[in-house]
Design a protein with these regions (language model features):
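Short catalytic/metal-binding and nucleic-acid-binding patches
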Residues: 1-224
Length: 224
């Protein structure tokens, strides 16, 4: 039996209940940072002060899907930190940068994303090496956030990002549902499509003419 092409899986909208924390199981494998291929990856990065040092997970431990889900839950339940991404203008800017870096710069094809109050998830197929992809996204968004929020003298993003290889179609769908269901699990909305800073919400608001976040070709209103 031939291998199903990823292009046939990228934006298939498979119905089903979004996972909550109790039934989420992710089996994730950490990638080498020189990884570059046409196979999707699951990326996560968070604000610098989003977790206190005694609650942050060592990077190596996050190769475990169970540890990653536990960290994500801590981020969703966090009460400390600046929560800069809770501000609509900042969250809008992050979404614009995700679209711009994928659609205009061509660094990746975006399949799912969500901007949470203190972290970001992105499911994408890289067209460039991961260091270039993450450096571009984190660098330009940090620079613009500094200007928007008049921040000085501190980091915006945690230096380390988390990247995991998507190994097959079932995992692809599970991770996409996990990403788009994050605002529901965190209690921010009742339905994934209600959250405007995600691919699910984007499809409802920006994608009314059809297509997907990766093929709409929407350029940010201001240069990124």
């Amino acid at each position: 039996m031939g291998r199903t092409p990823w292009s046939a899986l990228f934006f298939a909208r498979i119905p089903g209940r979004l996972a909550n924390y109790s039934d989420v199981t992710l089996y994730l494998r950490r990638l080498p940072h020189d990884y570059e291929t046409e196979q999707p990856v699951f990326l996560t990065w968070r604000l610098y002060d989003s977790l206190p040092p005694d609650r942050a997970f060592p990077t190596a431990a996050l190769a475990s899907g169970q540890a990653f889900v536990a960290m994500d839950r801590l981020l969703d339940e966090a009460r400390a930190g600046a929560f800069h991404l809770r501000q609509p203008a900042v969250a809008d800017m992050i979404v614009e940068a995700i679209q711009y870096n994928g659609n205009i710069l061509g660094h990746y094809a975006s399949h799912a994303f969500v901007v949470m109050p203190n972290h970001v998830h992105l499911l994408a197929t890289p067209a460039v090496a991961l260091p270039k992809l993450t450096k571009s996204l984190k660098g330009i968004t940090a620079k613009r956030a500094y200007a928007m929020l008049a921040l000085t003298g501190r980091s915006f993003w945690q230096e380390e990002s988390y990247d995991h290889l998507v190994r097959h179609a079932r995992e692809f769908e599970k991770i996409r549902n996990y990403i788009e269901g994050n605002p529901v699990r965190a209690g921010l909305v009742k339905e994934a499509s209600e959250y405007r800073w995600s691919s699910a919400g984007w499809l409802m608001t920006q994608g009314a003419t059809g297509g997907s976040p990766a093929d709409q070709g929407v350029r940010p209103t201001s240069a990124v």
